[in-house]
């Protein structure tokens, strides 16, 4: 599913991401835009460590989910990676909460550091009523 911007903003807010661990909704929206263009089905393979990034937040199979093909995977979210590709993003959000609970927080995502850090993020939620 490719979310419309305000639809995603409302969904993420409903699922409790706004302000979670001090991360604003606009930051999550920026992250989702740059990681997946709001597409729940996005996948990207990383040849270096043979891991794959899954879903709207591009959550990685080395640490966070099990895809049955990543060497030395940890599966800290205790889910199959396929759960991160569903139209219903409840489990993807739950896993993102787990990721951001680690010490580096939202800085765990390179796309956030490259595109969202120290930027004006208001356009990501403007006009959405959130």
Swiss-Prot record:
Keywords (A to Z) from UniProt: Antimicrobial, Bacteriolytic enzyme, Disulfide bond, Glycosidase, Hydrolase, Secreted
Active site: 35, 53
Gene Ontology terms: biological process: defense response to Gram-negative bacterium; defense response to Gram-positive bacterium; killing of cells of another organism
Example GO molecular function: lysozyme activity
Presence of keyword Hydrolase: yes
InterPro entries in UniProt: Glyco_hydro_22, Glyco_hydro_22_CS, Glyco_hydro_22_lys, Lysozyme-like_dom_sf
Catalyzed reactions per annotation: Hydrolysis of (1->4)-beta-linkages between N-acetylmuramic acid and N-acetyl-D-glucosamine residues in a peptidoglycan and between N-acetyl-D-glucosamine residues in chitodextrins
Subcellular location: Secreted
KW Secreted (keyword) present: yes
Domain C-type lysozyme residue range list: 1-130
Major place of residence: secreted
Disulfide bonds: 6-128, 30-116, 65-81, 77-95
GO cellular component: extracellular region
EC number: 3.2.1.17
Signal peptide: none
Pfam families: Lys (PF00062)
Note: Lysozyme C is capable of both hydrolysis and transglycosylation; it also shows a slight esterase activity. It acts rapidly on both peptide-substituted and unsubstituted peptidoglycan, and slowly on chitin oligosaccharides.
Family the entry assigns: Belongs to the glycosyl hydrolase 22 family.
Purpose of the protein: Lysozymes have primarily a bacteriolytic function; those in tissues and body fluids are associated with the monocyte-macrophage system and enhance the activity of immunoagents.
Assembly with partners or alone: Monomer.
Protein name: Lysozyme C
GN (gene name): LYZ
């Amino acid at each position: 599913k490719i979310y419309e911007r305000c639809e995603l903003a409302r969904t993420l807010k409903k699922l409790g991401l706004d302000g979670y661990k001090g991360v604003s909704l606009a930051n999550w929206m920026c992250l989702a835009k740059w990681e997946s263009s709001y597409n729940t089905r996005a996948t990207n393979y990383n040849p270096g460590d043979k891991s794959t990034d899954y879903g709207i937040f591009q959550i990685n199979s080395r640490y966070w989910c099990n895809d049955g093909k990543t060497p030395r995977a940890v599966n800290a979210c205790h889910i199959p990676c396929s759960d991160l590709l569903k139209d219903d993003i409840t489990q993807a959000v739950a896993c993102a909460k787990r990721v951001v609970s680690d010490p580096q927080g939202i800085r765990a995502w390179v796309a956030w550091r490259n595109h969202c850090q120290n930027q004006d993020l208001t356009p990501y939620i403007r006009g959405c009523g959130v």
